[in-house]
């Protein structure tokens, strides 16, 4: 199977949104992607180069996947960060244990969140980012840092960029959240799967370059957070 593939979801009518969009937005995309890779669901995508390649080459089959790394469009992996995330998830002390009655992870971690910095070029792009984005780029002496949630509760806060165990994610979250009920799904997923903070692994992220775009993003985040309280 080739290393790079492209998938594009079908849009369906959503009565509450009064528009055509991908089922359950990003949360639905992850669920459908997971179920497809695990063989639990037929192709839910409008464009799927994996399916096309398998159909062309009879000797090619869909391999088994253990971990998925999720990134936003403006998030960059840096040298060895993917390998370090995989190593952290594969550590025996981090192996997720699912409670059969509650169907949530009670030991180990089903998902891990790295530390996220700001791209160097973005941090100096405008006067706004120079003031609010902080020091961008990579610290040459990067190491583990303290985090109040991880230190006190042995769990971090998942913000949508990280790595998760594919089978555990599917088992715990496949039918856990009703449709059209949440806007911000990252916090919920982290709570169900038990999120661990890998503060010694760093990803580089973008940053809004203008006040208007910053406030639009902040408003969306606040709406999502209030909705799940």
Located regions from the model:
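Internal catalytic domains of large membrane-associated glycosyltransferases
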Residues: 1-229
């Amino acid at each position: 199977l080739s290393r790079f593939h492209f998938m594009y979801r079908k849009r369906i009518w959503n009565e509450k949104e009064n528009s055509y969009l991908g089922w359950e937005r990003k949360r639905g995309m992850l669920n459908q992607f997971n179920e497809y890779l695990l063989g639990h669901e037929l192709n839910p995508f409008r464009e799927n180069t994996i399916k096309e390649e398998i159909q062309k080459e009879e000797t090619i089959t869909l391999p088994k996947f253990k971990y998925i790394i999720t990134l936003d469009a403006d998030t960059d992996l840096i040298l060895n960060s993917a390998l370090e995330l995989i190593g952290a998830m594969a550590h025996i002390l981090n192996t997720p244990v699912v409670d059969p009655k509650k169907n949530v992870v009670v030991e180990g971690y089903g998902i891990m969140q790295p530390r996220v910095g700001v791209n160097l070029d973005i941090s100096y792009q405008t006067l706004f980012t120079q003031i609010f984005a902080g020091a961008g780029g990579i610290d040459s002496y990067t190491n583990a840092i303290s985090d109040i949630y991880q230190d006190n509760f042995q769990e971090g806060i998942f913000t949508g960029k990280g790595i998760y165990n594919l089978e555990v994610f599917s088992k715990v979250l496949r039918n856990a959240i009703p449709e059209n009920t949440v806007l911000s799904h990252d916090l919920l997923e982290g709570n169900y799967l038990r999120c661990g903070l890998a503060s010694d692994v760093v990803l580089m992220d973008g940053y809004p370059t203008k006040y208007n775009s910053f406030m639009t993003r902040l408003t969306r985040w606040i709406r999502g957070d209030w909705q799940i309280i």
